[in-house]
Design a protein with these regions (language model features):
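Active-site loop segments of alpha/beta catalytic cores
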Residues: 1-11, 15-18, 65, 94, ...
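N-terminal basic, low-complexity leaders that serve as flexible interaction/assembly modules and, when applicable
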Residues: 1-74, 78-82, 121, 128-130, ...
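Short, surface-exposed linear segments at secondary-structure transitions and domain or protein termini
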Residues: 80-91
């Protein structure tokens, strides 16, 4: 059966480290937590990634180029525990796509699979313990991270040929990476990190989704199903998107989605009603994340 745990994270890691919390002990062991029931095989698309470096010192903040080529504004000396500001993205037109990014997505990049034996060994060991083997491959988030949250919406109108080229390149590299894993292990779950919705619904129309995403998603899912070492094993296809998702569920069902998360309460997702409409859809989440920031005692309301 599919297993999923909502991870609410840790609120005081920085303070605990200052108070001599061991940093060489896995957190699950340190806090006596249950082990995760899934094992993640990385969907590392860029090889080589961009060199991460500080571009500008802004006093309390620092502007950093991350491994995906984005310019990100962080609090100085901190990378986790808050939402940074994304200032710039690597793809602005066809020239920047081809010169800065596309060559990094070449399936034949030297050294891309140097660590495959180690990754496969870990995955096989996890599978032998009954863990779900998950591959996170991105999707809408992939192209949004390349172009930018707002600019990608204009790109569908202004640069449709470029968008198709970017998505076709995504299919080739994802297909190659997952296929290499599937030579050795059966994949239990494809995880699409989307965040394609906001509080009121999807960022793009149904027609746009069908033109720029659905056929590529269907191609990837079809290929994974056909290559499974264990053809009788259920392939879970999970779509993760914040925002209100009721309008996109039928679209994602067309590409084979059978798991969805996190059904944000703040975006008026009614998990009871949606569960009635889609009784065979595995639904994860439905937790009001705002509770944890009201009062510390509010955590017990969850």
């Amino acid at each position: 059966p599919l297993y999923h745990a909502e991870d609410l994270g840790f609120f005081s890691l920085d303070a605990w480290r200052e108070e001599a919390m061991p940093t060489d002990v896995p957190r699950q062991e340190l806090f006596s937590l249950d082990r995760r029931a899934w094992h993640l095989l990385p969907g590392r698309l860029m090889h080589p990634p961009f060199e991460e470096k500080v571009i500008e010192d802004r006093g309390e903040y620092e502007l950093v180029r991350d491994r995906g080529g984005r310019h990100v504004l962080f609090f100085k000396g901190r990378r986790n525990g808050f939402m940074p500001q994304y200032v710039d993205h690597p793809v602005k037109d066809r020239r920047t796509w081809e010169e800065e990014v596309k060559w990094r997505l070449d399936p034949e990049s030297p050294g891309r699979f140097d660590d495959l034996p180690e990754l496969v060994a870990d995955a096989k060991a996890a599978a032998s313990r009954g863990m779900i083997i998950r591959v996170r491959i991105g999707g809408y988030a992939y192209i949004r991270n390349l172009i930018g949250t707002l600019k990608v919406l204009y790109a569908f109108y202004d640069m449709p040929d470029l968008v198709h080229d970017i998505m076709q390149t995504w299919v080739r590299i994802v297909d190659c990476i997952v296929a290499r894993y599937q030579e050795h292990v059966t994949v239990d779950e494809l995880f699409f990190g989307e965040d394609i919705c906001y509080k009121s619904g999807c960022f793009i129309s149904d027609d746009m989704f069908r033109e720029f995403f659905l056929p590529y998603y269907q191609e990837v899912v079809k290929g994974v199903r056909e290559r499974q070492l264990d053809p009788d094993r259920t392939l879970y296809v999970q779509v993760d998107s914040d925002g209100r998702v009721d309008g996109v569920i039928p679209l994602y069902r067309e590409m084979g989605m059978n798991v969805m998360s996190p059904f944000e309460v703040a975006a008026d997702n009614n998990v009871v009603e949606l569960g009635r409409q889609y009784p065979d859809l595995v639904m994860c989440g439905g937790i009001d994340k705002r509770v944890r920031i009201r009062l510390s005692s509010g955590l017990y309301e969850l």
